[in-house]
C-alpha cells in the first residue's frame, strides 16, 4: 500500500532545504521501492499570505490523512507584528495539538568530521550522542488562562499557566524510558522540583514509572544544573526527558555542542506513531533565498521519518550513511565550514547526498 507524505515547506529557508530533502526522498523512494506519494501544503507565514490564517483547515485535513509530515520551518520578522493568535508559529502549534504530537525526539550527535566546529574542545564532545525527549502539547505553552490584562491601577500584567496532568507526564515518560532501553539505558529527568509544584508531580511520576523499567537507570536534575552540565560534561547524558519549555531551551543548547543546529533533525510523534519531522533550526530569514542554508538537518529529518513512521529502516540508514560520506568528502555549508571558510551551496550539498545514494 502506498504511503502518503505531506510536505510543508513553510517560510524563510524552508522551501530551499525541503526541496533538497525531497530530492533525496525521490532517490530512496525509487531505489528501495517504497511506494511513497507526496502532497504539498501551506503552514505558517506562507499560509497567512495565501489564506489569512497560519494553519488552514485544508492543511489539517491533509495532515490527518497523511502517514507522515515533513516540515521546513515557520516564522519570520514579516509577521512579527501580527496578533499572537495568528502568527506563523501558531501553525506549528496547531499541527502538534491537532495531531496530538506529544513526544518530541531531538538527537544531538556530533559527527566526527565536524568535531572542530563544536564550541567546546574536541575531547569534551568527541563521541557525543544525546537524545532529548521533550513533551510537546502540555505545559506553559498551552496552559490556560493566559494573556495580558490591565490591573485596577492601570498597570499591564502578562500571565501564563504552567500545568501538567499525571497522564501527560506518564505517557512522555514511557517514550523516554523505552528510548533509553534501546540505547545505553540511562535516563535523566529534568525538572525544577525545588520551586515548581508542577515538576514535583513530574518527578513523582517518573519515579513511579522507573519501577516498570528496572533495566533503566533513572536520575533527576534541576534544569539550571542540566544547562550547566550540558556544557561542562555533556557525555554524561544518554537520554534526557523534560517538559515543553525546558526541552525547548535545552535541546537548542545541546544542538550547539554539535557544531551547528543545521545538522540536527527532530521527530514529533503521537501515540499511533504518526509523526511530523523537521529540522531543529528556525526559518533563518536573513539567509533565505541565498542558497547558503544547510539542508542536512532536513535530509536527516527525512531519514527519521522513514524510520519512525514509514517502516523503512534500510532507506533511513542509507540516507544517514550518505550524509556521513558527503562530510567525509569535505563538503561543508557555511555554518559548518570552520576555519577553512570554504563552503558549498544548499543545492550542491543536497545534490551530493542524492548522488551518493544513487551511486551506492
From Swiss-Prot:
Binding-site list for Mg(2+): 224, 248, 252
Cellular compartment(s): Cytoplasm
EC number assigned by the record: 1.1.1.85
Pfam families: Iso_dh (PF00180)
Positions contributing to NAD(+) binding: 76-89, 282-294
InterPro entries linked: IsoCit/isopropylmalate_DH_CS, IsoPropMal-DH-like_dom, Isopropylmalate_DH
Cofactor binding note from Swiss-Prot or TrEMBL: Binds 1 Mg(2+) or Mn(2+) ion per subunit.
Entry protein name: 3-isopropylmalate dehydrogenase
